[in-house]
């Protein structure tokens, strides 16, 4: 997760075992991304949308808030820019599925989406892009298994990366908790055997799954399997498979 999958970064880590040198390489890669974005869009809007991904994920909002990054713009006014970013394969996009069912593509809301970096190692560097490596607390926290809720979106990004690498289009679902008037969110939805599989992601060992439970109650007849991806051991909790994040690539 820290090094990522970029060949230069992986090679540097194997040769030096030095995260600082790896981070320098990843900063160079991000600079190349910025240069390419400027060629695609000389106004710099793509660069701004890209740089804001960590902040947008950190808000826990139900969508990427375009207006918070580009004044006067909305999601439906930057669809072409978003498409250019996705085509560059530097980011992954997850769409809100308004009516989660087997045909997720038919339920996607083009105006409600989240953006993830295609490489989580680059995300770890982008978060602290404007600071010195010594101020990048993600390395220390991940190595000591103390990544807090405030950086939980790093795990959400790695899940997005893994699912995308397995060939899945990315969807999520947000719905209202009628009692608290706050939103529940299913982080990812998969389509399988004419059913859907909801996935909730936890950045810690906590095995509570309120969103999964509420989703199951609402859409029980549509669900095939339920997953909670977290940092502890493989186990079952009723009909929910508690899956360590490192086993996610092997999920069938």
Locations of the language-model features?
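Alpha-helix boundary recognition
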Residues: 2, 54, 83-86, 164
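A short, surface-exposed helix-loop junction/capping segment
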Residues: 29-33, 58-66, 134-147
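Generic recognition of short, well-ordered alpha-helical interface segments
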Residues: 1, 21-25, 41-44, 80, ...
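Phosphate-coordinating catalytic segments in nucleotide- and nucleic-acid-processing enzymes
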Residues: 39, 59-60, 75-76, 92-96
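Conserved phosphate/pyrophosphate-binding and hydrolysis machinery centered on Walker-type P-loop NTPases
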Residues: 16-19, 38-43, 68-75, 149, ...
């Amino acid at each position: 997760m820290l090094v990522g999958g970029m060949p230069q970064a992986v090679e540097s880590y194997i040769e030096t075992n030095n995260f600082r040198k790896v981070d320098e390489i990843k900063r160079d890669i991000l600079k190349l991304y910025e240069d390419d974005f400027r060629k695609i869009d000389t106004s710099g809007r793509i660069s701004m949308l890209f740089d804001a991904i960590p902040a947008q994920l950190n808000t826990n909002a139900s969508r990427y808030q375009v207006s918070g990054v580009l004044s006067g713009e909305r999601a439906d006014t930057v669809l072409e820019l978003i498409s250019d970013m996705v085509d560059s394969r530097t980011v992954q996009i997850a769409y809100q599925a308004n009516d989660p069912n087997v045909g997720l593509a038919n339920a996607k809301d083009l105006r409600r989406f989240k953006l993830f970096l295609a490489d989580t190692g680059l995300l770890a560097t982008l978060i602290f892009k404007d600071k010195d490596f010594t101020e990048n607390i993600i390395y220390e926290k991940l190595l000591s298994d103390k990544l807090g809720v405030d950086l939980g979106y790093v795990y959400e990004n790695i899940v997005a990366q893994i699912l995308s690498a397995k060939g899945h289009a990315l969807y999520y679902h947000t719905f209202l908790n009628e009692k608290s008037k706050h939103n529940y969110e299913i982080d990812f939805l998969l389509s399988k055997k004419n059913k859907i599989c909801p996935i909730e992601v936890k950045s810690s060992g906590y095995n509570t799954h309120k969103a999964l439970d509420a989703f199951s109650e609402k859409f029980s007849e549509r669900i095939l399997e339920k997953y909670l991806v977290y940092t502890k051991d493989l186990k079952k909790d009723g009909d929910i498979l508690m899956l360590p994040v490192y086993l996610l690539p092997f999920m069938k």
